Amino acid sequence: MTDVTVKALAAERQVSVDRLVQQFADAGIRKSADDSVSAQEKQTLLAHLNREAGSGPDKLTLQRKTRSTLNIPGTGGKSKSVQIEVRKKRTFVKRDPQEAERLAAEEQAQREAEEQARREAEEQAKREAQQKAEREAAEQAKREAAEKAKREAAEKDKVSNQQTDDMTKTAQAEKARRENEAAELKRKAEEEARRKLEEEARRVAEEARRMAEENKWTATPEPVEDTSDYHVTTSQHARQAEDESDREVEGGRGRGRNAKAARPAKKGNKHAESKADREEARAAVRGGKGGKRKGSSLQQGFQKPVQAVNRDVVIGETITVGELANKMAVKGSQVIKAMMKLGAMATINQVIDQETAQLVAEEMGHKVILRRENELEEAVMSDRDTGAAAEPRAPVVTIMGHVDHGKTSLLDYIRSTKVASGEAGGITQHIGAYHVETDNGMITFLDTPGHAAFTSMRARGAQATDIVVLVVAADDGVMPQTIEAIQHAKAAGVPVVVAVNKIDKPEADPDRVKNELSQYGILPEEWGGESQFVHVSAKAGTGIDELLDAILLQAEVLELKAVRKGMASGAVIESFLDKGRGPVATVLVREGTLHKGDIVLCGFEYGRVRAMRNELGQEVLEAGPSIPVEILGLSGVPAAGDEVTVVRDEKKAREVALYRQGKFREVKLARQQKSKLENMFANMTEGEVHEVNIVLKADVQGSVEAISDSLLKLSTDEVKVKIIGSGVGGITETDATLAAASNAILVGFNVRADASARKVIESESLDLRYYSVIYNLIDEVKAAMSGMLSPELKQQIIGLAEVRDVFKSPKFGAIAGCMVTEGVVKRHNPIRVLRDNVVIYEGELESLRRFKDDVNEVRNGMECGIGVKNYNDVRAGDMIEVFEIIEIQRTIA
């Protein structure tokens, strides 16, 4: 055959040139349109195309559905029709011809090997039988020869000894008979052994033939999934209907093959089945109640443990006795017995500590693994950048003192701002944090309130500070909040610098201030103490530079240092909820550097720092030690005083925050339960108690705490203040709804209600009050509580009459003829009868007459007749005291 080009071959085969080139490429030949094609290459292409054309599906799956209706008789003679659908699936696999040939060859070889084994077994059995027959024939010949010799000897004895006794003959005959019986038994045993051997040989041959037939049927294609005994329902009637439908559809197909395949197995199973298998087969055929079959392959049983199992018991900080028993897989009574042996009595629901649980578990032979509840929290807090060198930092100075002693004004002059004039009432109502640059260095100031309601805020200020500047007015001296500030400073262990303010006033007396402070342990340096006293005037600016120098000198003595590099930590000075920015927290950084984007954990809250601002409202990207900043991005408003820590993983920060919330909730509930149990008897004995319900909203968290503490302290035995809800931010619709449901007063401190809340307030006619000064809020709540107090009853004597004589009246009984000696006697007023200045009766004046006329009152110096209600033992000389009850309205002190 001559070579042709690819293009000509494509025209001859009536295919495109590109397709032919692709087919050549698939066959492993690289060609272009103008290349020539040899005869060998054509043969290669043809073989490739034949292989592709001959490749078909190797597996064929057939699916069939059969539907039938089954009428099931029901109650009342009614029958119910049930639709039954039987789904069957058969898969046929196409065998490879080479694989089929290989399987046929293997099968032929196996059959030949089995036939050879069968022939060898038969020949072996024949040889053994022949050898056995020869042995038996030889033994038989020996026996016959012996018997013949015996008979000959017997005949000789009989001929020679004719005179032998008959008993000897009988004995010999008996002996011969026994020998014959023994020989017969031996022969039968040998025949039985030969028969068993032949049966064993036949059984081996039959088993080999059966296995060959099974292998023959296994080599043919069979369906992958056998659904012959599969039912879609458990009802006996439904299963019978399914089987009947299968028989109708299948017909006689496949029966002969299945019968042939099953016949040898059935024959072989007759000897191989055990008693348990036969019992299970009978149970499967017999079924149970309702026709349910039990699968023979589902064998299950419980074996009792023969030895104790030692477990690893994980124990938290607290655990109940029942939970401990579950962890050890024992009964609760056993744990209680073990505790009683150790000398501890407990119930199944009692909570025990970790140490007790460890002792009990180890006593019962288990291994204890102690787990701390705050393990994750400790791991998160300890995973920090450490090792950086500490550097000097600016001091944190807290301004403390009594209200109106000039703390904020003094700080104003230092910062050259006018913060005090902008505050409501001219008093500071939350902590202000500022840092100022001086000629000698930077100082961070914390301005705390001086009012008594802000004790907790002053305590937080003292804990976060390095130096306390105690401001005392020279004209006012030491006041209650001044003493409290001294106590906070001593409790925090920080040095105190005293600023004697208002020194420019004519009535200023600095020496008096020194004397009063010395009584509380604050001694000036000139008296041998450790406190610096500086005379200043916030109004005129006198002594400000000396105060700053004193602060920096004290800071230099303290040698304040902090790590500037690394993950930051600090404290929340103040927090509030801004309507546009969300939760805002004022944070004082103690060490490290706080960056924008850091993940912070703050008490119960967490979040990523989205923005940072300084006290001037300017955006900053980082804040070092002793720098106060406002941060945005927390999940909620944190509590003032909470520790702020930068962590690495936001997921772990969230887990720690949720754990803290849960723990706080548990402690709170436990405390409430304890107080309920302790006050149970008091609640049973006390009478009706009025409550003033308040929903409080304020601008910052510190104000919420201060106002709540002040209002709760106003509670008395008769009227109690109850804070139904409190929070930071404006008054919302939820707050108004809560107030309406609990009949509470809505109080807004430096916040206002939104539009939706105002609608609810108007529709429900709620009492809404706005305040900007805490004095006014407390005074009005006192007035509301005073209105709920029950009035005080006071007895006022209005008249006194002396009994001169007693006479009888058929209508009123004993009538006392009296002379009014003091005041006025009124009818129907309560009276007391006195005898020798001792009250002998207290009742009501029923009848009052003067000269037979009923009168309402009798004045001093007049005679009258008095009838006492339900009392007839009036004597001459008694005194009748007339009084009235006056209600006096009480107030909350």
Swiss-Prot record:
tr-type G domain span: 392-561
Location of the region described as G3 in the Swiss-Prot/TrEMBL record: 447-450
Q: Which CDD domains does the annotation name?
A: IF2_eIF5B (cd01887), IF2_mtIF2_II (cd03702), mtIF2_IVc (cd03692)
Instruction: Please note every region of biased composition (Basic and acidic residues).
Output: 93-159, 166-216, 270-283
Region Disordered: list its residue ranges. Answer: 49-303
- What this protein is called in its record is Translation initiation factor IF-2
- Role, per record: One of the essential components for the initiation of protein synthesis. Protects formylmethionyl-tRNA from spontaneous hydrolysis and promotes its binding to the 30S ribosomal subunits. Also involved in the hydrolysis of GTP during the formation of the 70S ribosomal complex.
- Which keywords annotate this record? Cytoplasm, GTP-binding, Initiation factor, Nucleotide-binding, Protein biosynthesis
One annotated GO molecular function:
guanosine tetraphosphate binding
Q: Where is this region: G5?
A: 537-539
Write out the similarity annotation: Belongs to the TRAFAC class translation factor GTPase superfamily. Classic translation factor GTPase family. IF-2 subfamily.
Renumbered to this chain, region (G4) spans: 501-504
- Biased region (Polar residues) positions are 68-82
Name the HAMAP family on file. Answer: IF_2_B
Q: Where is the composition biased (Basic residues)?
A: 254-269
Binding residues for GTP? 401-408, 447-451, 501-504
Q: Which Pfam families match?
A: EF-G_D2, GTP_EFTU, GTP_EFTU_D2, IF-2, IF2_assoc, IF2_N
Localization in the cell: Cytoplasm
Q: Where is this region: G2?
A: 426-430
Q: Which GO terms describe its cellular component?
A: cytosol
